[in-house]
Amino acid sequence: MAQNGIGTIHKLDMYSTVTNARFNITQLISEISYYESLESPTASMTISILDATDFKHSVPILGNEQLLYSFSDTFDDNVRLFGGMRLYKLANAMRIKRDTDSYDLFFTREHMVQDQYAVVEETMGPMLASDMVENIVRGIMKSTKMLRCEKTEGLTVTTFPRVSPFTAIDMIASEAKSARANSASAYVFYETNKAFVFSTLDALFEQKPVRTFYYLENQVKSDNAIESSRILSLEQPRAFDMMGGVASGQWGVKISSIDTISKTFASTTHLYGKSFNDTGHADGTTPLVSDQTQKELATKITREKLLVTSAGRATNAYVLSKTPDAAHQYRRRTEFAGREIVSLSSLMSSAIKIAVYGNSSLKAGDMIEIFIPATGIRKPGDVKNKLLSGKYLILAICHRFRGDGTYITTIECAKDSFSTKLSGGDF
């Protein structure tokens, strides 16, 4: 029977590197924490163990053990989290009572372990940056996992100086310009249980929400379906950070570039309001700051960045007469760096964390909608908190399964716009 907050562990088998024997460790767990994040190229897992059988020494656990897992919530439409990982660290071991030890096992994907050994030392191109990512995932990492790759604009040539595959992808992400119109081209590369994803934040924000969650008072009774959408706890670690925005370039950034071949110098200025209006958003067209704040803070440059580029030669007649390919094979970062810096700084200035009943279908990169009721003095018809309610992008997610069967999902998420206007009496 489906129950909110209850999970099912279908498989949790670890294989010894000494005897190749298989051990089901379900009865030993205190807690399983499965993590995904837009800031990490791989998923990971931590398992807290309560060991009263000296399992650690009898196996023995020496590192690099393989773990095969499968778990989910208990609803009929559940999506299983499943796959394999490698044990890379045992830590926090202590004797908690006679003949009983506790310790934590840290697992990561096989490709993360291999990433420390694999080397990318070649020149790729001319080709799309998105195709380079696919070449690395398929050709160097030898991964057959699904890959979702947002297409990039323009052919480019990149030389990788003996770096790991994930470092190479980071290099590509920092230079890739999205083929989408008016994109800030802030690319991220991350892993979910199902796929690798190479995408811009713009594209992620423009997805439709997969689920709506409600911050209901505890005394409100509801049926099982509504209860599954209840927010159990809500925390706002940062609502805004004005001084941090000044330092990071949220309000205004100047991008200067020099092309040493064509001997040209150029500069562009990007202010918060213009960059906001130039890109797409999840919830509407209202920035997260007031017009007055923009007038006071977003009219001057607070950060400057100098880039060495090859963009100047793309329009230089002499260079083009000698190397025609320069017209479309050049470094494009100067074309989007300002919008990217402003967008990323704005995104990281605020975030909220919520806990909900375990939901194995949620993953990093999903959009969700959050409804928070209005409190205090309010206008007739106001039913929701207009500042906090809205559409959010999941930046990081943790699925927590406890030994007693309890299953909770914790989410860190952020929004990039308001759905209602700050002026005109909406607030």
Task: Tell me what each language-model feature is.
Residues 200-206, 215-345:
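Extended, domain-scale alpha-helical bundle/helix-rich regions
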Residues 68-73, 129-136, 219-231, 240, ...:
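Short, cationic low-complexity segments
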Residues 1-66, 70, 105-112, 148, ...:
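Juxtamembrane "anchor/assembly" segments of surface/extracellular structural proteins
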Residues 83, 103, 185, 192-194, ...:
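Residues that flank catalytic or metal-binding motifs in active/ligand-binding sites
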Residues 54-147, 157-158, 173:
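Surface-exposed cap/loop segments at beta↔alpha junctions
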Residues 102-105, 109-111, 148-243:
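Short beta-strand-centered interaction patches in the first periplasmic/extracellular domains
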Residues 116-120, 209-212, 422-426:
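Short, charged, solvent-exposed linker or helix-capping segments at domain edges/interfaces
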Residues 26-35, 87-91, 154-156, 221, ...:
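A broad structural signal for short, well-ordered beta-strand segments within beta-sheet-rich domains
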